[in-house]
Amino acid sequence: MKNKKISGAEAVVHSLLNEGVDLIWGYPGGAIMPVYDEFYKFQDKLQHILARHEQGAIHAAQGYARSSGKVGVAIATSGPGATNLVTGIADAQIDSTPVVCITGQVASHLLGSDAFQETDIIGISMPVTKWNYQITKASEIPEIFAKAFYIAKSGRPGPVLIDITKDAQFELFDFKYSKCKGIRSYNPLPTISEDSIDNAANLINNAKKPLIVWGQGVILGNAEKEFKDFVEKSGIPAAWTILGLSALPTSHNLNVGMVGMHGNYGPNILTNKCDLLIAIGMRFDDRVTGDPKTYASQAKIIHLDIDPAEINKNIIADVPVIGDCKDSLKRITNKTEKKSHSKWISKFDDLMKIEFDKVIKSDLNPLKDGLTMGESIIAINEFTNGDAIIVTDVGQHQMVACRYANFVKSKSNITSGGLGTMGFALPAAMGAKMGALNREVVAVIGDGGYQMTIQELGTIFQLQIPVKIVILNNDFLGMVRQWQQLFFDKRYASTEMVNPDFVAIAKGYYLDSERVKDRKDLKPAIERMIKSKKPYVLEICVEKENNVFPMIPTGASVSDIRLN
């Protein structure tokens, strides 16, 4: 290839191969056809999976990135193909998922002329990407692709978009590729201040009622071991945000549950009673803090984060520790005294007993005839032994799955956290499975979100991707209905769903499928699903008004958490 000029389209393929990419998700079209022609020629080295919608492609790339730890890649044509990626790009941005999106564009001489399928995808995507760039000359391709992958995966990860004009795809040039090792003025790994390490360790060693709240930063930083070492040496109870779940085994004796709007009673209440809050790789999202004016106002706060922009953005930190948490946790642990906070931890146990009596018992062991979401998740646990990757959509089922799913390995909980994108789970699950072929992947989805990307059953069928799909069907947009019940006097405006026959639809895609309505049939059906080596769709008909508690009303203090 040294003495042979190649086209920009072929250069795209070689750039991807140089970055170790062997799988991409996409949907072809006119402005990206030269690249697709090269995919055909290189299909022995680079697998392209045809999604049924570009949103499915980007969510699949996200799921792949989250389960594998690699960069996900999605590709689409110009115009509507590119704009159909935007929701997934925004989702990846707020959840710090490393994806590279490639879009075709009209020829450079047509830019700005409102040509067929022309959109300014650079302008559209600028607010929701970590970086984007429009290529108009083939010679730019190697450098831009190298930068794109470096930016997507370095520091705080995120999405990058490369827009390539059609003429650049045809243009010939001498190809040479060098991986990017750094970019002037871009510092993804801030130097950790030794003073901040000392100050953090001093606060930790003198705290009487400390609480750790960890987020996805622990997982993104591959810092699970360092985090576990810190938790166990310090003896501090640790609670998780929804994206942090699975970094520490669910059964760990210092794992005290979930914080936030539908989190556990104990960690939410005791956030406002601790004397030290140690936030690790989390961003103090409003769903976690409730009213920021009252959030942990009595406590000293240590905030570990790789992104300086998150420090003091929502909650003021007494000791910010900016940098890679894998390194900072190791250094803090070295200076942390080994302790046990048994008296303090007993308060979490006491509050968990209250939550069990008022919420969990009826969720998991209901006296009523109808199935609940909670008992469905517990039944899935029984047959996966906590070893599966659980991919959830958005809504009540998401909160219930996160509350009751059992995890023993990291990178096992995949969901749309910050953006709350309905329709995420089905395509993300097929991506997660392709990124972790040796692991069971179970998608847990509500009947509303399922129908937003239901067409990806076609992708699952065509590739025979052996994901297990559980639809928790309550014939409602459940989370919205719950709010209408609690705050709008049961005025159920546009939330009742008249659903199709989900089993028949799955069978129309030639997928194994069944429906469960009775408790006696639940576990046998889940066992059949998990034992199957093929894709499987299981519809579980649950109570129509099965609400999710605890709950912190929007804008209220975490101390105002409701149990009913």
What is the meaning of each model-derived region?
Residues M1-N3, S139, F175-Y177, N202, ...:
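Phosphate/pyrophosphate-binding active-site segments
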Residues L161, H303, V391, V444-I445:
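Generic enzyme active-site microenvironment
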Residues I102, L110, D114-Q117, N312-N314, ...:
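Thiamine diphosphate
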Residues V231, T271, M373, T453, ...:
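Active-site-proximal structural scaffolding
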Residues Y27-G29, H48-H59, A74-G81, T136-K137, ...:
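Active-site nucleophile and cofactor-binding loops and adjacent substrate-binding regions
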Residues D163-A168, G395-H397, E543:
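A glycine-rich phosphate-binding loop feature that marks nucleotide/adenosyl-phosphate handling sites
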Residues A9-D22, G30, V35-Y40, M352-P427, ...:
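Active-site diphosphate/adenylate-binding microenvironment
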Residues K2-S340, A379, F383-G386, P466-I471, ...:
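N-terminal alpha/beta PP-like core and its mobile active-site loop of ThDP/TPP-dependent enzymes
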